[in-house]
Swiss-Prot record:
This is Purine-cytosine permease FCY21. One of its GO terms (cellular component) is plasma membrane. It is a multi-pass membrane protein. It comes from the Eukaryota. The lineage of its organism: Eukaryota, Fungi, Dikarya, Ascomycota, Saccharomycotina. GO terms for molecular function: nucleobase transmembrane transporter activity. The gene is FCY21. It comes from Saccharomyces cerevisiae (strain ATCC 204508 / S288c). The chain crosses the membrane at residues 91-111, 119-139, 162-182, 199-219, 222-242, 261-281, 296-316, 341-361, 394-414, 417-437, 461-481, 494-514. GO terms for biological process: cytosine transport; purine-containing compound transmembrane transport. PANTHER family: PURINE-CYTOSINE PERMEASE FCY2-RELATED. Residues 1-90, 140-161, 220-221, 282-295, 362-393, 438-460, 515-528 are cytoplasmic. InterPro entries: NCS1, Pur-cyt_permease, Pur-cyt_permease_Fcy2/21/22.
Length: 528
């Protein structure tokens, strides 16, 4: 096992690099980061004042050992995170959480699949989704580019900015959905003296702020151990489930309706596993270029697959038990997965200790929120150059504040709408993967084809005409293939009695076809 790199980005060495980076921005007018932060200072007095204030904020952040680096490429001198364990544990903790457990329960509860069918879907579609996360994590170490900056090479400059905006919406949306779910679990604990929903939101977001403010180093240090209490709670759930003797395998079914349900559940599982794709490189950019790429890839595969399989299969097992028990089913119908977990752990079970376990499980969402609220800042900066002038720490704080401001009313008025909205926005991942993989494997073929110095050059980066066309056409494919409560596409409704969700499949395939038709023309007439 590689030696663990203990918080190398948070001590004296990290602070030295941060201060050095800030000084170079202030004095070297030839660097890309200087152009970003100090453009037209001499001719614009107001801008000079704003830039000075932003520089001051960055210095405060650096003084607190917080990461001040934004979307600028990470230099080789700054690549000090040589721990493969850091890369793997990042996603291990982020997926050993309540939301992944909740996804698994959907197989029996929503899609009428038995335990065996649910497990098959969980194994197959998770594997399809997580491979892209592991693959693009390799790019972070090799090129030192954030995922949305890397996207300028992979999908084109214009399309990358569209994806950056969508990614920003996804980050804040999933942060809201996760926070609402956790606050609802906290609200069930200690009947008669419950934690108010708004207070639960403050607890979850507040803890997320503390971790994400300090950036890469503290995030990896937190995620390295955040899985431990969550895993312990899941073991307690397994023990209580076994003692209840309520688990059943269920009956095997077949036919078009079952096929449609398998596809729909598979779409949900795939979306959760692949959801980290547009974040991937952000969490390996400080790894040295010499790091073995196969070790990164396969450690990420294990770090992703293990918690996803474990939590989702457990969720499916608990759901199967609830199907045969009216009391547990009522808890689920009224309070979703949080209610079902409460039913397993508290009434006629371990009582006070069970409530304590519910609290721990609700706090597990912090580990899932942290990547959202860190990447949100980088996505905003990558959308438009003026936004990159605002320090990362400010965007992180603003993103968390926005999530809190929306999550509190969502708890009371529109939590269902938020879930529907996020189910819809997740389809962009398949389109992104189709375009990005096409560009790398068909047109670039090796890392040597990426000139990192071009990261902010409109003249040298791919324009993004092909990428934008593929995104638009892929979106039409998604609309025809998606199967949600509020929308069933014309093609998806042909599968079974309730439709089958093939939005990811159509979006990916249509985007792939259009991109590879348009990209050769873009290269021929524009040369990039």
């Amino acid at each position: 096992m590689p030696q663990t790199h203990e918080m190398s980005l948070n001590g004296t060495q990290y602070l030295k690099y941060e201060l050095k980076d800030l000084e170079s921005r202030a004095h070297d007018a030839k660097t890309p980061s200087t152009n970003e932060f100090y453009d037209d200072v001499e001719s614009h007095g107001t801008e000079e004042l704003v830039e000075a204030k932003l520089s001051f904020l960055n210095r405060i952040a650096a003084g607190l050992s917080a990461e001040t680096k934004g979307i600028e490429p990470i230099t080789e001198d700054e690549k000090t995170d040589d721990s493969i364990l850091n890369a793997a544990s990042m996603w291990f903790s982020a997926n050993m959480v309540l939301p992944a457990y909740a996804i698994g329960a959907l197989g029996p509860m929503v899609f009428d699949l038995n335990f065996g069918q649910s497990v098959f879907v969980i194994i197959f579609f998770n594997l399809l989704g997580l491979v892209s996360v592991a693959f693009f994590s390799v790019f972070g170490a090799e090129l030192g580019l954030r995922q949305m900056i890397l996207s300028r090479y992979l999908v084109g400059n214009i399309a990358a900015r569209i994806f950056s905006f969508i990614n920003f919406i996804a980050c804040i949306g999933w942060g809201i959905v996760n926070t609402v779910a956790s606050s609802q679990v906290l609200n069930m604990v200690n009947p008669g003296h419950q934690c108010p929903l708004w207070a639960g939101c403050i607890v979850i977001i507040g803890a997320t702020v503390i971790v994400t403010f300090f950036g890469y180093g503290v995030i990896h240090a937190y995620e390295k151990w955040a899985w431990v209490p969550n895993f312990a709670v899941f073991l307690v759930i397994i023990a209580r489930l076994a003692r209840s003797k309520k688990f059943v395998l269920g009956e095997w079914t077949s036919g078009p309706t079952t096929a449609g349900n398998v596809l729909s559940f598979g779409s949900t599982v795939y979306g959760f596993a692949a959801g980290w794709t547009t974040y991937a490189a952000d969490y390996t950019v400080y790894m040295p270029r010499k790091t073995n790429k196969y070790k990164i890839f396969f450690s990420l595969v294990v770090g992703l697959a293990t918690p996803l399989y474990f939590t989702m299969i457990l969720g499916a097992a608990v759901a199967m038990a609830a199907i045969g028990d009216p009391a547990w089913k009522t808890y689920y119908d009224e309070n979703s997965i949080g209610g079902l977990t409460f039913a397993v752990l508290v009434p006629n079970s371990v009582h006070g200790f069970g409530q304590f376990c519910c609290v721990l499980l609700s706090l597990s969402t912090i580990a899932n929120n942290v990547p959202n609220m860190y990447t949100i800042a980088l996505s905003v900066q990558a959308t438009w150059e003026p936004l990159a002038k605002v320090p990362r720490v400010i965007w992180t704080l603003l993103g968390n504040a926005a999530a809190l401001g929306i999550a509190i009313p969502a708890c009371y008025y529109f939590s269902t709408f938020m879930n529907y909205f996020m189910d819809s926005i997740g389809y962009y991942l398949a389109i992104y993967i189709a375009i990005a993989c096409s560009e790398h494997f068909i047109y670039r073929r090796s890392f040597s084809a990426y000139n990192v110095d071009d990261w902010d050059s409109w003249e040298r980066l791919p324009i993004g005409i092909a990428g934008t066309a593929a995104l638009i056409v892929g979106a039409f494919g998604v609309a025809l293939g998606m199967c949600q409560t509020y929308w069933v596409g014309e093609i998806s409704r042909l599968i079974g009695d309730y439709g089958g969700d093939i939005g990811f499949e159509l979006g990916l395939s249509w985007a792939f076809i259009v991109y590879n038709i348009a990209r050769p023309f873009e290269l021929k007439y524009f040369g990039r």
